[in-house]
Curated annotation (Swiss-Prot):
PANTHER family: ADP-RIBOSYLATION FACTOR-LIKE PROTEIN 2-RELATED. Gene3D superfamilies: P-loop containing nucleotide triphosphate hydrolases. Belongs to the PILZ group of genes that disrupt, when mutated, the microtubule cytoskeleton and produce mushroom-shaped ('pilz' in German) embryos. This is ADP-ribosylation factor-like protein 2. GO terms for biological process: embryo development ending in seed dormancy; embryo sac cellularization; endosperm development; tubulin complex assembly. It comes from Arabidopsis thaliana (Mouse-ear cress). Expressed in seedlings, leaves, roots and inflorescences. GO terms for cellular component: cytoplasm. Signal peptide: none annotated. Pfam families: Arf. NCBIfam families: small_GTP. Disruption phenotype: Embryo lethality. Embryo development limited to the formation of a few giant cells lacking microtubules but not actin filaments. Failure to localize KNOLLE in mitotic cells. Giant nuclei and nucleoli found in both the embryo and endosperm tissue.
Amino acid sequence: MGLLSIIRKIKKKEKEMRILMVGLDNSGKTTIVLKINGEDTSVISPTLGFNIKTIIYQKYTLNIWDVGGQKTIRSYWRNYFEQTDGLVWVVDSSDLRRLDDCKMELDNLLKEERLAGSSLLILANKQDIQGALTPDEIGKVLNLESMDKSRHWKIVGCSAYTGEGLLEGFDWLVQDIASRIYMLD
């Protein structure tokens, strides 16, 4: 996000945030968006392309871009980076065999200049499944401690199925973004 975008948001006080939600396929991105919005999560289909959900959260309007995570779609993720205020990376904490892929894709995202100023929330999802790695274990696998010190980030354990941890994560994300782009509040 450039300086002009920040100034524009301060001046207009538009109270909108653009959130990009990505992660490998079947990590729970769509379920999380629906759960936060209080919608039915009993029947979820894989996201082929993207969905945009606009929700009011606290006193802000969140435009959440839920982008499919299939291998064939990942090369298109870069089309959604512009003007992203917050990046949500969703990890299936129970899918141990794909954690290397997960780390590689996150590393690639974090190299993107257009995402450099975005707050990063890592949701260690599926904590309700026996054998799932804890958020600390996921953090070690993803090597989060080596991340650029200027990046604002947080990892939160959650369950899209039960809803546990989702509010904690989104509360942090919204407050972190607000403290950066709505400085005059």
